[in-house]
Each structure stands twice: as C-alpha cells, then as structure tokens.
C-alpha cells in the first residue's frame, strides 16, 4: 500500500514538474524583451536615485519618487552602502536606503550610474522564477557648504528576478513575465 502511494506521488510530482517546466520556458525573443525590460528598470532606478539624492529636489517630490522606485523591487530587498573611509558594507531596506539618501549631510549631491551590463544569464530557480545579476558602476559626489568634497565609484551587483504574473483585463486573465529588482550588493568601492 505504501509503495503504490509512493509511486503514485512520484508520478504526480514528475508530471506536474514537466507541465510547469513547459510553461516556464522562455523563448529567445521573449528573453531579449525581458532583458530589455530589466535594463530599463535599472536605468529608471538610476534616475530615481539621482533625483532622490539631489538637494534641489523638493521633499514632496522626493517622496513621490521614492514610492515609484519601491515599485521596482521585490519585497524584502536590501541595498548596500559603502565608503572609502571604512571597509564595512552596511545593508538597509530599500525604503531606509532612500530615506538616508534624501537626508545626506551635503549641500550638493550628484549620483550617476554607468556601464550597466548583465554579468550572469537568467537561470531558472526551483520556485519557477528566473534569477540573474546586472552590474552597474555608481559615481557619487557630495559637496558641503564649505567646499569639502567626497567622491567615490562603487561597483554594485543587482539581483534581478523574472517571474510569471497574472492580471485581469476586461474580465480575461492574462499571464505575463515581470521583472523585479532584488538586493543590491556592493562588490567594490574606490576613489
């Protein structure tokens, strides 16, 4: 009796896995579209960070941009912060990172992202999501009222999640692939 249940359960799991695998395969054309969407979201995040960090941005506008930026991330994502003055890397929730960025003690802040590129191809995970990593370089410049400057360039690795989602449009359920950003890890900081 136990063997029949075990064999039946094994077949059910095997067929369910094959059906799920067939649904989750991404065609090369779809993968190019997903890659393009992921890079677009990374560029959007770079613009949002620049706006949030700028001292010329009004408080209400910065908060509106924070809300928009948070929509790009998977729940629980964290962002790494580093400095030339310490080897420690501190991680904050995305919202806390944006709040700290907005409150930086500089009179002028300039943040630019460049050299954005995939460093790992999307890989299918057991939960059905695809995961990849995009690397960016961030140039940070902060200037105080008395002219003191801090500058660094940080290499950051951004986890990218691609998952199938569902929505209803005109009463019909539609499936689509969406891209969410995950943790942003600091891999190198230099002058």
Say what each PLM segment does.
Residues 62-110:
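Short solvent-exposed beta->alpha transition segments
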Residues 22-65:
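Short, low-complexity N-terminal intrinsically disordered segments enriched in polar/charged residues
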Residues 1-28:
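Bacterial Sec-dependent N-terminal signal peptides
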Residues 86, 111-122:
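Long amphipathic alpha-helical segments
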Residues 51-54, 58-67, 111-116, 172-180:
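Short glycine-rich, low-complexity/disordered patches
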Residues 19-24, 103-114:
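Short, charged, low-hydrophobicity "junction" segments
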Residues 36, 83-86, 153:
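Coil residues (strongly favoring Ser/Thr
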Residues 117-191:
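Exposed beta-sheet edge and beta->alpha loop/turn motif
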């Amino acid at each position: 009796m136990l063997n029949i249940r075990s064999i039946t359960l094994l077949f059910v799991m095997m067929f369910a896995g094959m059906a799920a695998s067939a649904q989750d395969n991404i065609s090369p054309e779809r993968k190019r579209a997903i890659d393009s969407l992921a890079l677009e979201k990374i560029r959007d995040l770079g613009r949002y960070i620049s706006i949030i960090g700028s001292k010329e941005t009004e408080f209400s506008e910065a908060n509106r941009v924070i809300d928009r930026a948070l929509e790009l991330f998977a729940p629980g994502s964290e962002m790494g912060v580093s400095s030339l003055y310490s080897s420690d890397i501190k991680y904050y929730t995305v919202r806390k990172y944006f709040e700290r960025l907005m409150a930086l003690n500089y009179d002028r802040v300039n943040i630019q992202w460049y050299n954005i590129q995939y460093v790992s191809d999307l890989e299918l995970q057991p939960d059905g999501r695809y995961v990849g990593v995009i690397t960016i370089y961030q140039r940070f410049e902060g200037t105080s009222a008395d002219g003191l400057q801090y500058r660094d360039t940080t290499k950051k690795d951004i986890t990218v999640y691609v998952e199938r989602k569902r929505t209803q449009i005109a009463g019909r359920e539609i499936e689509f692939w969406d891209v969410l950003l995950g943790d942003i890890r600091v891999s190198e900081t230099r002058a």
